[in-house]
Amino acid sequence: NKYCNIKCSKVAHTVCQYGESTKPSSKNCNKVSITSVGVTEEEKKLIVDEHNRFRQKVAQGLETRGNPGPQPAASDMNNLVWNDELAYIAQVWANQCQFFVHDKCRNTAQYQVGQNIAYSASTAAYPGIVSLIVLWENEVKDFNYSQGITKENFAKVGHYTQVVWAKTKEVGCGSIKYIEKGMKSHYLVCNYGPAGNYMGQPIYTKK
């Protein structure tokens, strides 16, 4: 397939490696009971709207949390739009059931691609997609804008910084819902183009 021509360092592209099917991997997914695969049209809209709501909140200087807070306003925050290709590649990876691991090569012909992963589970109902994105947003509480992204803080703030990375333009996500040990689990992989989270670059330009 065409993704075998996209090279990242020395690793095969996710879609080259695992094939073009968006069916869950029989090898890894048999440990859980999968109940649904992929994001609905409604969920797509919720993903884009929630990213843009939060990006605008930060851009307008309304985010009071931080270490220290508040976060400064931004002058260059793009509005994100949905990208089906990013979503497709994210879905192929989500379907491998390699939970909490990032794939090594997810770029498109157009973009270097970044990625956020989230998981939540409940006995009552599948956690909603917005609640998963909010987990990423909440990392703002540990972020120091003037310090930016460092090797030391990256594990604590890297999801937040990708969500609000000003130069990112598009997002596409894949998801699976499954039951494991009686828990209704929702696993979300979002891919971002162009990628954020470059060390030494500001996450956005201060207004």
From Swiss-Prot:
Q: Keyword annotations for this protein? A: Allergen, Disulfide bond, Secreted
Q: Which Pfam families match?
A: CAP
Residues forming coiled coils: none
What CDD domains does the database record attribute to this sequence?
A: CAP_euk
Name the predominant localization.
secreted
**Which Cys pairs does UniProt list as disulfide-bonded?**
C4-C16, C8-C105, C29-C97, C173-C190
Report the superkingdom from the record.
Eukaryota
Q: Where in the cell is it found?
A: Secreted
Q: Does the keyword Kinase apply?
A: no
Span of domain SCP: 48-192
Q: Which PROSITE patterns match?
A: CRISP_1 (PS01009), CRISP_2 (PS01010)
Q: Which GO terms describe its cellular component?
A: extracellular region
What tissue specificity is annotated for this entry?
A: Expressed by the venom gland.
Check the record and name the SUPFAM superfamilies matching this protein.
PR-1-like (SSF55797)
Family, per entry? Belongs to the CRISP family. Venom allergen 5-like subfamily.
Question: Subunit details for this protein?
Answer: Monomer.
The protein in question is named Venom allergen 5
Q: Which organism is it from?
A: Polybia scutellaris rioplatensis
